[in-house]
């Protein structure tokens, strides 16, 4: 918890518009016409409601069972809604294999060319393969399926099929800047 609080303080200092950026991501609702091929101007938003930062239990890159952790774990009660971080198309909606490559029940969404997010250890999945979702749509619910030691959301961000730390991209325009530079 102390490391999480310190990381949050550093993030806030590096992003003077933190509150504005954070709050705009919680204006949920339908965002028109941004998929396929682009993210809307709000960028990547948190997959959980406000307060999630205090519940980070494992950061990206930390050691877990002898290897680097490839996502961010956020401890939340079972059944907490999980939201799409951006508009996109569901490319995986695993609701039948509770082991699911150790992710348990999970959802993967393609948001733009080369940008994907993954939401794992869900208690249930609320979307289907091929479905288009909008930022803020409920896609599943926090659980503890797969290789999990308790209820939490395992959240991953992929850029060009490489897992990267999602934390700096949440509520900022970093992803838009990355896409401008890359494409």
Q: Where do the PLM segments sit?
A:
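Extracytoplasmic and endomembrane cell-envelope/extracellular-matrix remodeling and assembly machinery
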Residues: 13-42
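Sec-exported extracytoplasmic/periplasmic mature domains
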Residues: 23-31, 138, 144, 171-175
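Zn2+-dependent peptidoglycan hydrolase active-site motif and core
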Residues: 84-126, 151-159
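Short peripheral tails and domain-boundary helices/loops at the edges of structured domains
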Residues: 116, 120, 158-178
């Amino acid at each position: 918890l102390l490391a999480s609080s310190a990381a949050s303080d550093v993030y806030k200092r590096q992003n003077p518009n933190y509150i504005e950026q954070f709050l705009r991501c919680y204006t949920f609702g339908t965002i028109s016409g941004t998929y396929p091929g682009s993210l809307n101007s709000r960028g990547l938003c948190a997959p959980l409601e406000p307060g999630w930062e205090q519940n980070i239990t494992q950061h990206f890159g930390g050691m877990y069972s002898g290897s680097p952790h490839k996502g961010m774990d956020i401890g939340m009660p079972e059944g907490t809604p999980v939201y799409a971080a951006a508009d996109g198309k569901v490319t995986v909606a695993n609701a039948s294999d509770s082991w699911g490559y150790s992710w348990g029940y999970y959802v993967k969404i393609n948001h733009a060319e080369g940008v994907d997010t993954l939401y794992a250890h869900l208690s249930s999945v609320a979307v289907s393969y091929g479905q288009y979702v909008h930022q803020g749509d409920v896609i599943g619910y926090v659980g503890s399926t797969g290789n999990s030691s308790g209820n939490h959301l395992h959240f991953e961000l992929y850029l060009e099929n490489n897992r990267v730390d999602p934390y700096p991209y949440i509520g900022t325009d970093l992803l838009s800047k990355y896409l401008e530079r890359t494409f």
